[in-house]
Regions:
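Catalytic donor-sugar/metal-binding loop of nucleotide-sugar-dependent glycosyltransferases
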Residues: 166, 176, 180-195, 200-222
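Acidic helix N-cap motif at the loop->helix transition within catalytic regions
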Residues: 46-54, 98
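Short, acidic, metal-binding catalytic loop of nucleotide-sugar glycosyltransferases
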Residues: 25-34
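Non-catalytic, C-terminal membrane-associated alpha-helical segments of glycosyltransferases
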Residues: 235, 239-240, 255-320
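Short aromatic/hydrophobic "clamp" motif used to bind/position activated sugar donors
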Residues: 86
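Short beta-strand/loop segment that forms part of the nucleotide-sugar
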Residues: 35-43, 62-64
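Acidic/His-rich active-site region of diverse nucleotide-sugar glycosyltransferases
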Residues: 76, 95, 102-188, 192
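Glycine-rich, basic loop-to-helix element that forms the pyrophosphate-binding segment
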Residues: 23, 63-81, 91-93, 102
Length: 320
């Protein structure tokens, strides 16, 4: 049997130590070897280093003194990651048997793949038991006019309808296995997104370098969706809308952006303003308008960077 390659598992914690420990316990239950584990703490109110070091000595903890967001937090661990593959997983997710091995074997047999995600299923509403309700079995391409796309299989009952690996438009940031060489060929995740759309942007850049994105449904992860961010919070409204526009700016040509901006100005903005106002959701309305404003102010700034930058902020702490 071929020797399994080293995998560097990276998860980001932000005021969610209970979720992080549940993830680490599930990793112990369904171990893959060889494996190195990194927990990046994104400036949680209570520093979790002591607890993690005492109870999970195999875990390497990286502490940032400011919240760097999803991409920035994950990127912080990359200079220390030695694995042939990098497994990015949300701390509000849990492992299943042979998940990581199945993903690694897929990558070993598909050299065109830059990234592969497992099938994602929801926990039940109490977040205490798993369910057969699918969250993700792939994603379609982002529409050039609306900047929206579809999550394949979302909220379907799992009846084994997704049983073979498929080429897809985008991996899911909650769980994705990436080749280490992607960092050199494509670059890091773009940390300006902070929250949402980072993996979609990364997948677009991978495709431009000739690498494909896949889903392998024979590997499964359970995800406690919205455990970290409220389902209709102002935070989520702001970053989803801000980053949807930023994604289009980064990945579409000037010619293709013309119909998108026409649709945005004359349909998307009026529709959202009207909807939030009629519902009395004034915090969400303000968040939406701030998202649009951010892109107007940011429009002339440089938004493209391929170079891999391993320089570290001064405020990181690395613990063996």
């Amino acid at each position: 049997m071929r020797e399994l390659p080293l995998v560097s598992l990276i998860t980001v914690n932000y005021n969610g130590l209970d979720y992080t420990t549940e993830l680490l316990n599930s990793i112990r239950s369904f171990s893959y070897a060889p494996l190195e584990i990194f927990v990046v703490d994104n400036a949680s109110v209570v520093n979790p280093e002591k607890i993690l070091n005492q109870n999970y000595p195999e875990v390497k903890v990286i502490r940032s003194e400011k919240n760097l967001g999803f991409a920035g937090g994950n990127n912080l661990a990359l200079p220390f990651a030695k694995g042939k593959y990098l497994f990015f997983i949300n701390n509000d997710a849990e492992f299943t048997s042979n998940c990581l091995q199945t993903l690694v074997e897929f990558m070993e047999n598909h050299l065109d793949a830059g990234v592969v995600s497992p099938l994602l299923c929801y926990f039940n509403e109490s977040k205490t038991t798993t369910s057969d309700l699918i969250q993700y079995a792939g994603m379609t391409q982002v529409n050039a006019l609306t900047a929206r796309n579809k999550t394949i299989g979302e909220k379907e009952r799992d009846t084994n309808q997704y049983s073979t690996a498929q080429k897809i438009a985008y991996a899911h940031g909650a769980a994705m296995l990436v080749r280490q060489k992607v960092l050199k060929d494509v670059g890091l995740m773009y940390d300006k997104f902070f929250l949402y759309y980072e993996e979609l942007d990364w997948c677009e850049r991978m495709r431009k370098e000739g690498l494909n994105c896949y889903v392998e449904p024979n590997a499964r992860i359970y995800h406690k969706e919205s455990a970290a961010v409220g389902a209709s919070s102002a935070l989520k409204t702001y970053f989803l809308n801000r980053n949807r526009i930023l994604f289009m700016r980064r990945n579409k040509s000037s010619l293709k952006l013309i119909p998108f901006f026409i649709f945005l100005i004359f349909f998307t903005i009026p529709k959202n303003v009207y909807t939030f106002f009629v519902r009395g959701e004034f915090k969400l309305l303000r968040a939406f308008l701030e998202a649009v404003k951010w892109n107007v102010v940011d429009i002339n700034r440089k938004i493209f960077s391929k170079k891999v930058n391993y320089s570290m902020p001064r405020d990181y702490i690395f613990k063996n």
